[in-house]
Curated annotation (Swiss-Prot):
Keywords annotated in UniProt: Calcium, Cell adhesion, Cell membrane, Disulfide bond, EGF-like domain, Glycoprotein, Integrin, Magnesium, Membrane, Metal-binding, Repeat, Signal, Transmembrane, Transmembrane helix
Protein name: Integrin beta-8
Domain comment, as recorded: The VWFA domain (or beta I domain) contains two cation-binding sites: the ligand-associated metal ion-binding site (LIMBS or SyMBS) and the metal ion-dependent adhesion site (MIDAS). Unlike in the other beta integrins, the cation-binding site adjacent MIDAS site (ADMIDAS) in ITGB8 is not functional due to the presence of two Asn residues instead of 2 Asp residues. This domain is also part of the ligand-binding site.
Chief subcellular location: membrane
Protein's organism: Mus musculus (Mouse)
Effects seen without this gene: Embryonic or perinatal lethality caused profound defects in vascular development. More than half embryos die at midgestation, with evidence of insufficient vascularization of the placenta and yolk sac. Surviving embryos die shortly after birth with extensive intracerebral hemorrhage. Conditional deletion in the neuroepithelium results in bilateral hemorrhage at in neonates caused by endothelial cell abnormalities in the developing cortex.
Membrane topology: Single-pass type I membrane protein
Sequence ranges assigned to domain VWFA in this UniProt record: 146-384
Family: Belongs to the integrin beta chain family.
Amino acid sequence: MCGSALAFLTAALLSLHNCQRGPALVLGAAWVFSLVLGLGQSEHNRCGSANVVSCARCLQLGPECGWCVQEDFVSGGSGSERCDTVSSLISKGCPVDSIEYLSVHVVTSSENEINTQVTPGEVSVQLHPGAEANFMLKVRPLKKYPVDLYYLVDVSASMHNNIEKLNSVGNDLSKKMALYSRDFRLGFGSYVDKTVSPYISIHPERIHNQCSDYNLDCMPPHGYIHVLSLTENITEFEKAVHRQKISGNIDTPEGGFDAMLQAAVCESHIGWRKEAKRLLLVMTDQTSHLALDSKLAGIVVPNDGNCHLKNNVYVKSTTMEHPSLGQLSEKLIDNNINVIFAVQGKQFHWYKDLLPLLPGAIAGEIESKAANLNNLVVEAYKKIISEVKVQLENQVHGVHFNITAICPDGARKPGISGCGNVTSNDEVLFNVTVVMKTCDIMGGKNYAIIKPIGFNETTKVHIHRSCSCQCENHRGLKGQCAEAAPDPKCPQCDDSRCHFDEDQFPSETCKPQEDQPVCSGRGVCICGKCLCHKTKLGRVYGQYCEKDDFSCPYLHGDVCAGHGECEGGRCQCFSGWEGDRCQCPSASAQHCVNSKGQVCSGRGTCVCGRCECTDPRSIGRLCEHCPTCHLSCSENWNCLQCLHPHNLSQAALDQCKSSCAVMEQHRMDQTSECLSGPSYLRIFFIIFIVTFLIGLLKVLIIRQVILQWNNNKIKSSSDYRMSASKKDKLILQSVCTRAVTYRREKPEEIKMDISKLNAQEAFRCNF
């Protein structure tokens, strides 16, 4: 804290020198000097190290350090002491003009400002290692944005009823959007899936009509077709939708992400306007394929993220993979597109779970036949324009950005969370803090981009690193940039190249231990000191090149989760963060404290607000339950030998008298409760007989059930015949049956006496 205050006051002092003259300068300098001197004496002076022999090394010690380049600067006859705090150098007689220091400058571009929503458009920040700079970013939403709304519709057969609703949506939606936009345009595109097996049927009879199961005439399947560019002509939009036919495929997921990426990057084909709010409405009732799904069809070429429309048809559908969620999110943000998922059915929750991975996206559930589609679009748009969030792009190595949103209601939130319920008259402020830990390997100028999500304007932050002294570039002062000339026997190196004979210089002093490599295998030994290698991964440093800033744990692709700096293989977290990866907010430790103020009841460690018990005997959310932690038996186990003192030494007997004198003895009956040892053979036969009897009983029961079922069937058949015989014989039809002729070898003689019947008597059958 003191170092930061000294740096601030030092900058104020030198600013007074540059901006004032005469008595005002003297009074101002004296006032600032007194403050600096008082602060400087309250803490150990790290700038006055005797090992500092150069200006560059001096300025690396801290932001409060300075180097006097005055040629005849001598203090107390003890030699040159050019490195010290700025206040001490002034007190020793060094003129302010002769003090080298690393200042922090923030310059915002006020001239030629073209941004109207995000200001400032450009910021220039000059930093040195260990310093930080602040500036404010303002975001003001405009009234009645121009809006470009592109319908991307899943035209598989199951969406037939929803597509019919689109015929009348254009005119009604344009009337509702007129309340929020002065310029509203609509466009239309369709998608199904990749036109290869196993996503579609390649049978000759179905290749041109995938939805024959629905008794419908369908168009051939396709990956993505751009049907209508963005237009103000609502009638043309309705005609394009009316001409649209459905298609089909055979698997459940669709190729929605493929089509979304093409609709986002094909800016000229779609007709996206730079000044408009860009909305991409995706209508579907199924999930979408993700990256690597195309391996099933033998498609292994990764999606390149470029536009591949030819005659408004996506021509790389069968040769290029589906995009990943990260790639799709990047393209949507780069092209300032907000996505609205209009999903019907149970797949709504699948898309809702994706929203944290797609910044600026919103999911809504549509009713049967898309009856609420217009209201869904309007409500989603109102939510989009009421949220202001920012995202950092083109992260600069060695530079950390900390962004805090200051909402119109006064609330402060992390920049990635942003503010909600923002109206067109509100202004959202973002406090941006830039911290540079070390100088970049390549040096020079870099920049980062702060981008409000969904806005077509950004803020470009230029980073200027102050890693060297001005006296090194001034021929007349170059001799005062170091106290002593280097050893002529040692080679001169420029931190990147060094030509010398390794056998010429001993390397024993460059090893932390004799059995370890020179400079930890990551540097060369020159004159008894390690010169560490340069690497693109980060900075290697330390007396033996044993430290670096890239070997720390990573989280989500960022070292120390982006909330800390890597020093010596361990994460040094920024304020407000903790954990081995700096992944936990500091406030999460409060959830690990019990009512007595103990962290995890003294039996564990707190990791991201959850206790990890280090004592294997303890359990519970706060490791508060430990049934065996205080058992006297385990505590007095060593006293057991005192019960049999015959073979103990005198020292052991003395310990028994002192440590185990008050031990209570509890004798236990060790008589076995079992009358005899277990008979394994008897147990086996018992289990075998019981199992056999149970199986036999099951067989008998099943047999009885089958017999009962057969008897019931025979009985029901007999009852049926009996009921037929009891019917009135007068209503029976003729009983004339088919005559069966047969022959016997010796037919038996049958004598029959049939009396004649009268002609008037009817033939009667007697049964």
